[in-house]
């Protein structure tokens, strides 16, 4: 089963705490797109999109969309004061130069070495990898938000990814409906429990070794 609305929002709310004042932020589609809803009103950050916008704002009301202004997923957005526009060459130059402070992405699998697989399910048609490869390699911090298991109940946190990789050794932090984990020295490190989950439950639903670094653990 997929995640419910409340679980998706809780993950996004926790991910929002990783964004700090003055950051340049890039968000993937799905749960990452919910993150701006949970930022403090006084938070001064700039959202960047691969299609060439720095300074993306909230979604417009129905009927107020600008046909020439959208995010990388093609959804209408507003621009904030001070926003700038540029071609995709400049956009990816920003990414490859390491100008993105944090990217928040979805995932199909993450390995204990921080490898990320988030673009291809064998047998399904997909448009391509998009900008995730560059973002995962070059952003200063990579946060993954996802369900802890897939729709068949199989762990998505694994010893080794079995799906085609987006990038190797890139993930810093993972937030699921069960837990918050860091990746360090080829291990998952359990930092927080979510939704009343237990250490035993998280361990059972994770297909790799977990080290525990929590208060009173």
UniProtKB/Swiss-Prot annotation:
Instruction: List the Gene3D superfamilies hit by this protein, alphabetically.
Output: Glutaconate Coenzyme A-transferase (3.40.1080.10)
Record key words, sorted: Transferase
Residues of the active site are 50
Q: Which molecular function term from Gene Ontology is one that the record holds? A: CoA-transferase activity
SMART domains, per the entry: CoA_trans (SM00882)
Q: Tell me which EC number(s) this protein carries.
A: 2.8.3.-
The protein's assembly and partners? Heterodimer of a subunit alpha and a subunit beta.
Q: Which family does it belong to?
A: Belongs to the 3-oxoacid CoA-transferase subunit B family.
Q: What is this protein called?
A: Probable coenzyme A transferase subunit beta
Instruction: Name the source organism.
Output: Bacillus subtilis (strain 168)
């Amino acid at each position: 089963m997929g995640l419910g609305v409340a679980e998706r929002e809780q993950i996004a709310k926790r991910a929002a705490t990783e964004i700090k004042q003055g950051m340049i932020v890039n968000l993937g589609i799905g749960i990452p797109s919910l993150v701006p809803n949970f930022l403090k009103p006084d938070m001064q950050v700039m959202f960047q999109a691969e299609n060439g916008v720095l300074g993306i704002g909230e979604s417009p009301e129905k009927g107020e969309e600008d046909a020439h202004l959208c995010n990388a997923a093609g959804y209408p957005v507003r621009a904030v004061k001070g926003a700038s526009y540029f071609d995709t060459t400049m956009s990816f130059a920003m990414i490859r130069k390491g100008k993105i402070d944090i990217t928040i992405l979805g995932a199909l699998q993450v390995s204990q070495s921080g490898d990320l697989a988030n673009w291809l399910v064998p047998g399904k048609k997909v448009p391509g990898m998009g900008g995730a490869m560059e973002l995962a390699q070059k952003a200063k911090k990579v946060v993954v938000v996802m369900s802890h298991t897939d729709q068949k109940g199989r762990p998505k946190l694994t010893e080794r990814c079995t799906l085609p990789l987006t990038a190797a050794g890139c993930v810093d932090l993972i937030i699921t409906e069960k837990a918050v984990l860091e990746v360090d020295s080829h291990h998952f490190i359990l930092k927080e429990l979510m939704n009343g989950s237990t250490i035993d439950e998280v361990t059972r639903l994770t297909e790799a070794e977990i080290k525990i670094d929590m208060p009173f653990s």
